[in-house]
Structures are given as C-alpha cells and as structure tokens.
C-alpha cells in the first residue's frame, strides 16, 4: 500500500484439513515406527511431528518466529531475516520484506572464497541461534536461503522452529562432545538422558554411536 516491494506466502486452500486427516492415522504411524526403530519412543516422535506440522500451518506462529530471529539478527553484516509486515499477514497469509537477489543454487557459479563465506554464514546462523537464542530452524534446505544482492544471506522460512531450554541445549553439546571424543558409552548415556533413546534399547553402544 505504501509502494514497498513485498513477498507474499499464501497457504493452499484445504491443505490444513487434508494434513489433519492424514495425522489421524498417527497410531498406525507409531506402530510402524516402533517396529522399524525399537530403541525409540514412537508415540513421542509422532506427537512431536504432529505439533511441528500444526505450527508450520499457522502463519501467525511463523510470523512470531520470524520476529524472534529478525530482532536478534537486525543489523548483522552477513545474515538477513526479512521482516514481517503484520497488517498484511494472517493465519494463512504471510507478507514480508522482498529480498532482491538470487536463488541459493547460484552459489555454484561463484568463487571458492565466496562459497566458503556463505557456508560459514550458514554454520554461524545455525549454531549461534541454537546456543544464544535456544532456537533451531528445523527446515534447513537451499530453497529457504537467498543470496541477497547486498552480499548477505537471507533466510526466508521459519514455519518449523523448535524452541529449547538452556539445559536442553547443554545436553546437545554433551552429545556433540561425546561424538568428537568417540565416546560411545557417553553418547548412549546422553541420548537416554534427553529421551532420544529408550533406556536398555536393544543395541550395543557402538551400534548407537
């Protein structure tokens, strides 16, 4: 309305109802997961999946996630989170700043130095968000990144975001340390502590690691 260029994401009509109907089969999904992955809690996995899908279908929830990341990275020299325009957004419509730039695939045509710089930006975004904000963007793929004309990397999809407590992030750090130390027993202990693995799951430590 004021002449700004914007990007508009519109939810396909009926998609929420269709997905909800599919998720009604969650008991069957849980049973199959229990057979394939006997060391995991299948019902917990299915409930987590259901919660994340419901959140991803709610564009007001996504707008709130964008706000968290945009506030944190505002002014960052390498990372751009396009801000939401709330008066043009709703549960099924999300309107943000427009990003002038190229699709992420264009990185393959750039110099090795530029590719290294962009890779470092992605790495820093993921782990800084997790370790400082206790948030994780759960949909990291090239379609959700843009190479902005000003040199920054723009991140454009925040429908699938997980928010953690500080102690949960510390447990993830313990998992990573165990992997780096090649300590299979410690890796198993931490995996059980964070409920990724059932206690006494029918696998050896080395198989889990």
Feature-to-residue mapping (PLM):
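Conserved catalytic cores of large enzyme domains
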Residues: 1-209
């Amino acid at each position: 309305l004021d002449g700004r260029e914007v990007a508009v994401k519109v939810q396909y009509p009926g998609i929420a109802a269709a997905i909800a109907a599919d998720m009604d089969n969650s008991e069957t999904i849980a049973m199959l997961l229990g057979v394939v992955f006997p060391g995991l809690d299948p019902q917990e996995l299915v409930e987590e999946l259901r919660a994340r899908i419901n959140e991803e279908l709610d564009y007001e929830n996504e707008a709130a996630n964008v706000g968290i990341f945009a506030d944190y990275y505002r002014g960052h020299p390498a990372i751009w989170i396009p801000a939401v325009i709330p008066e043009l957004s709703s549960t099924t419509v999300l309107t943000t700043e427009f990003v002038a730039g190229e699709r992420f695939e264009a990185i393959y045509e750039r110099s090795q130095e530029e590719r290294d710089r962009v890779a470092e930006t992605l790495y820093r975004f993921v782990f800084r968000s997790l370790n400082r904000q206790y948030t994780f963007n759960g949909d990291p793929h090239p379609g959700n990144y843009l190479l902005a004309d000003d040199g920054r990397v723009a991140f454009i999809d925040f429908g699938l975001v997980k928010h953690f407590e500080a102690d949960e992030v510390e447990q993830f750090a313990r998992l990573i340390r165990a992997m780096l130390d090649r300590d299979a027993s410690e890796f198993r202990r931490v995996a059980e502590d964070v409920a990724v693995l059932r206690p006494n799951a029918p696998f050896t430590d080395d198989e889990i690691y």
